[in-house]
Swiss-Prot record:
Name of the featured protein: Kinase-interacting protein 1
Gene, per the UniProt record: KIP1
Role: Probably involved in the receptor-like kinase-mediated signal transduction pathway.
Record domain NAB: where: 10-90
This protein's record includes keyword Cell cycle: no
Composition bias type Polar residues, residue spans: 599-610
Organism from which the protein derives: Petunia integrifolia
InterPro entries: NAB, NET2A-D/KIP1-like_C, NET2A-D/KIP1-like_dom
Subunit-level organization: Homodimer or homooligomer. Interacts with PRK1.
PANTHER family given in the database record: KINASE-INTERACTING PROTEIN 1-LIKE ISOFORM X1, PROTEIN NETWORKED 2D
Protein keywords: Coiled coil, Cytoplasm, Phosphoprotein
């Protein structure tokens, strides 16, 4: 709910603009109709001077006029059919919008007559004798109040009872049974009609309240916009503050709704007590009457008395325990997401309470009707003095009244049970509202708090509270003594069973603990739900549980979860198809008792439920069999529980999916950061390597120059004093091999020096290669268009030949052929223009190929010139490098030649295609005169413009020309 409110928080204005554009079909139809009208007018304008010419006009041109009328009728019919189709689609769209967004549609909820649709007048289907054939709108069904509805229902009941049913054997019932069944169904219908009226009134009031709130929101938003426009400043509410405000509003609304529901429930309880007093009075009268006239022949009738005081005391104790347990289970702070989930659960619970309170109205109305009928029967029995003499008939009537009294007692039990359930849910809702209101001030963001583990004591306490709720509901059934014994047994054995579940194995405990806080928080969140019965399902599900408790009190309805052991020690909790299952607590085996102490000290609980697919299918079959045997009410409850469980599973899967997507986004972001860091580190390392290589090259050059100077100085023959006392062995031994090895060891990874000519050639070749991508893209797109042009022209020529064949065979007149040829002619002209543009574009490709060829030739000349000349630098341009460059250039020239050949072939094909298109266009123009019509239309458009002279100086009045229609009928005066 909070997410919907947040998503709609800023969507105050909604503007939808429906722009219509003219359909090509409509435009073509209008154009064709205009041409046909012009041709028919020309045909009509012709005058017949002689009898022969008039006869020719009659016999020759009359079929053309008839054909024109038929074609006009067909065109109008097609237009009407399209309009009808669009009207149906629009009606369907309106119904769909009204179904999906009922709050946007003004609903006129007219009351229905009796139990079905409103009655139509007798003359509704009769067509009027004259005038339009449109039927009149039927009058609105008469609106009746609740009393009138009840009176008509009772009258109909009496009328149907008085009628004779001849075919009673078809239903398999006797006459008396059929009358009883009709009576029961009539009462059910009356109760449902009452419920419908109540829901309708509540819906209308809720709808008015909704619209009022929407108007207030719009007014406040408009005021905000005005203030922002006036002062030029705005304020944005922070996310935390907005969430807090929405949570406070939701809690306040829930609290007000619960208060109103409690007041209604108290009033209903008071009414039920008054009706119960009436039943007690009737029972006392019946007992006194029986003692007076029948003696001790029949046992006294006993009235079921509801233990209201005991229920009140137990509800007070339950309220205190619920508050203590809620405080114990949530000692830490709540995150914003946890708070939103809890508020959503609370809102769903309040909505279910509203439905339960409204259903209590139906039950109370039925209880009141039964009590009134019982009083009437007792009073009739007392007033009928003639029947007092006949003891046999008197016994029969008293027995019938006692059976009626027994039914009323059962109905009273249902009222008391529903009352206790509602009070229990009210207590729980109040406690949750108070708890969330207290936690609202200490809400933290989602990242600042982790889920904590739930202790076994808390789980046991939750189970005890729920078992007390079951006992509270079962105490209202005095006939279920055996069920209460089983309930007390389960209540006493509850902690033992929980400890048994807790001792299912330390391996699964350690494994689930190793899975991380996510699995633990999931188990913590789902644990109380599984241990407690479904409290949020509403009174219907609670009443279903009440009927099932005496049969199987040791079973608990939970979601289907499996714990499978993988690799000896790992357990995986997997959600499967959510079904209604009965899971019994396992008893500890002797082998497991040794591990009980270890698992008790761990402080965590492990959910261990193993169900195979076969057992799931059996449980499903049992549920459906139970649903069919239990009747309509239990079937609805079971279906409601099934739907709620599926919806809960869907929410969990959606939450897990969002968590996985969030993890994927985080992982992708981390990988992006790591990639950036690696790129920066690699760039720094490359820069350092480059600097070190430069330093090494400088050091090598310096050492070589020093060694050379030292040799020259020592071996200089012009200085005799320097070589006087020196011997050859005293000179430093400098070996070329050692120097080469030193250079190789130092410059292992150093790149070879590049000559200027080699660098220049490499730059030229790289420039040509860089242009290859753009060139190939343009060439491929141009080459691809050739096949497209060829296919289009071929299709158009086929269509033109088909139209000509129709004209030759005489199947269609020339006007229709001309209307079919016109769009083909336009398309052919467009293709002709596109072919011209394509040829112009290919000229640039040819120029670029020539430029690339000349560039490659110049590179070849530079390579040959570099081999002949000697380079003055230390490094020379070797023949190996020249051969390498020469091979690259030759490959590029070969590719260039192939591309030029393909381009020339494509140009020749397009040129032939262009000639064919021009020839076809010329033939169409000569045959049908399509260019002339376009020039006439252009002239008519130009004539309709106002000249500048007339616009400035005005126009002189001219003589009126005779219109086209006056020429058609010259004798008629306008």
């Amino acid at each position: 709910m909070l997410q919907r409110a947040a998503s709609n928080a800023y969507s105050w204005w909604a503007a939808s603009h429906i722009r219509t554009k003219q359909s090509k079909w409509l435009e073509q139809s209008l154009h064709d109709m205009q041409g046909r009208v012009e041709s028919v007018i020309k045909l009509i304008e012709e005058d017949g001077d002689s009898f022969a010419k008039r006869a020719e006009m009659y016999y020759k041109k009359r079929p053309e006029l008839i054909n024109f009328v038929e074609e006009s009728y067909r065109a109008y019919r097609a237009l009407a059919e399209r309009y009808d189709h669009l009207s149906k689609e629009l009606q369907t769209a309106n119904n769909t919008i009204a179904t999906i967004f009922p709050e946007q549609i003004q609903l006129a909820m007219d009351e229905e007559d009796e139990y079905g649709a409103p009655k139509m007048p007798k003359d509704f289907l009769q067509m009027p004798a004259s005038g339009s054939n449109i039927p009149k709108v039927p009058p609105k069904a008469p609106i009746k109040d609740l009393k009138g509805l009840m009176s008509t229902a009772s009258k109909q009941k009496q009328g149907k009872q008085s009628s004779k049913i001849e075919d009673a054997a078809k239903s398999g019932l006797s006459k008396n049974e059929a009358i009883e069944e009709i009576d029961k169904l009539q009462k059910d219908i009356l109760a449902l009609q009452t419920m419908k009226e109540f829901i309708r009134s509540s819906y209308q009031s809720s709808l008015e309240k909704f619209r009022g709130l929407e108007n207030q929101i719009m007014e406040k938003q408009q005021k905000i916009c005005e203030l922002e426009d006036e002062f030029g400043e705005g304020r944005v509410i922070e996310d935390a503050e907005a969430c807090t405000l929405m949570a406070e509003a939701a809690l306040q609304s829930c609290q007000e709704t619960v208060t109103q529901l409690q007041e209604k429930q108290e009033s209903y309880t008071q009414e039920a007590r008054e009706e119960f007093k009436k039943i007690e009075d009737a029972c006392n009268k019946l007992n006194s009457f029986r003692h007076k006239y029948l003696g001790d022949q029949i046992d006294e009738a006993k009235v079921y008395i509801s233990p209201i005081q005991e229920v009140d005391k137990e509800i007070e104790s339950l309220q205190e325990k619920i508050k203590d347990q809620i405080d114990a289970t949530s000692k830490g702070s709540l995150t914003m997401s946890q708070l939103a989930e809890k508020i959503d659960e609370l809102v769903n619970k309040v909505v279910s309470l509203e439905t339960a309170v409204s259903s209590q109205t139906l039950l109370l109305e039925r209880f009141r009707a039964e009590a009134d009928e019982l009083q009437a029967q007792v009073q009739t029995l007392e007033d009928d003095k003639a029947a007092l003499t006949d003891t046999h008939n008197l016994n029969i009537r008293v027995t019938a009244i006692e059976a009626k009294l027994q039914n009323i007692e059962n109905l009273n039990k249902d009222v008391v049970n529903q009352n206790s359930c509602l009070r229990t849910h009210f207590v729980e809702a109040r406690a949750n509202i108070d708890h969330l209101s207290d936690k609202l001030s200490s809400v933290q963001p989602d990242e600042e708090i982790d889920g904590t583990d739930s202790s076994p004591d808390q789980v046991i306490a939750l189970a005890e509270i729920k078992l007390e709720e079951e006992s509270l509901k079962q105490k209202d059934h005095p006939s279920s003594a055996e069920g209460l014994k089983n309930l007390s047994t389960i209540k006493a054995e509850g902690p033992k069973n929980l400890s048994t579940i807790k001792t299912e194995g330390p391996k699964s405990l350690s494994t689930i603990k190793a899975e991380g806080p996510k699995n633990l928080s999931t188990i913590k969140a789902e644990g109380p739900k599984n241990l407690s019965t479904i409290k949020t399902e509403g009174p219907k599900s609670l009443s279903t549980i009440e009927t099932e408790v005496p049969k199987n009190l040791s079973t608990i309805k939970t979601e289907d979860k499996e714990v499978r052991k993988q690799q000896g020690s790992s357990t995986v909790v997997s959600d499967k198809k959510t079904t209604m299952k009965h899971v019994t607590f396992a008893q500890p085996t002797p082998a497991e008792k040794g591990d009980e102490k270890v698992s008790a000290q761990s402080g965590n609980t492990s959910v261990y439920e193993t169900h195979t697919q076969k057992s799931a299918e059996k449980d499903d079959e049992l549920n459906w069999q139970q649903m069919l045997l239990s009747g309509l009410d239990d079937k609805e409850n079971i279906l409601l529980n099934e739907y709620t469980a599926i919806l809960k599973n869907y929410k969990e899967v959606t939450k897990k999916l969002s968590d996985i997507e969030k993890k994927d986004r985080d992982t992708e972001f981390e990988l992006t950061l790591q990639t950036r860091e690696l790129k920066s580190a690699i760039a720094k390392r490359d820069e350092e390597i480059h600097n070190l290589r430069q330093k090494l090259s400088l050091m090598q050059q310096g050492n070589a120059s020093e060694n050379k100077a030292l040799k020259e100085e020592l071996l200089d023959p012009s200085d005799p004093s320097s070589a006087r006392g020196l011997k050859p062995e005293d000179l430093p031994q400098i070996k070329d091999g050692d120097d080469e090895e030193d250079v190789k060891t130092i410059l292992v990874d150093q790149r070879a020096t590049v000559s200027p000519l080699e660098g220049k050639l490499r730059m030229s070749i790289d420039a040509i290669l860089d242009e290859n991508l753009d060139f190939w893209l343009r060439f491929s797109s141009a080459f691809h268009q050739i096949q497209k042009f060829k296919t289009t022209v071929h299709d158009l020529q086929n269509e033109i030949s088909k139209a000509r064949d129709k004209e030759m065979q005489g199947n269609s007149p020339r006007v229709d052929v001309k209307s079919e040829i016109r769009p083909l002619y336009k398309h052919m002209k467009e293709i002709q223009n596109e072919l011209t543009v394509w040829l112009e574009q290919t000229l640039s490709l040819k120029d670029e190929l020539e430029r690339r060829f000349s560039a490659l030739c110049s590179i070849q000349e530079e390579i040959s010139k570099g081999l002949k000349e000697e380079v003055e630098d230390e490094t020379t341009f070797s023949s190996h490098q020249a051969a390498k460059f020469q091979g690259e250039v030759l490959n590029m020239k070969h590719e260039n030649k192939k591309v030029r050949e393909e381009l020339e072939a494509g140009i020749s094909r397009v040129t032939i295609l262009q000639e064919d298109v021009e020839k076809t266009v010329t033939q169409l123009d000569q045959e049908f005169g399509l260019t002339g019509n376009q020039s006439q239309l252009m002239q008519s458009v130009s004539k309709s413009r106002i000249p500048l002279q007339s616009f400035i100086f005005g126009t002189k009045p001219k003589k009126e020309k005779r219109s086209l229609f006056s020429r058609m009928n010259p004798n008629r005066k306008f």
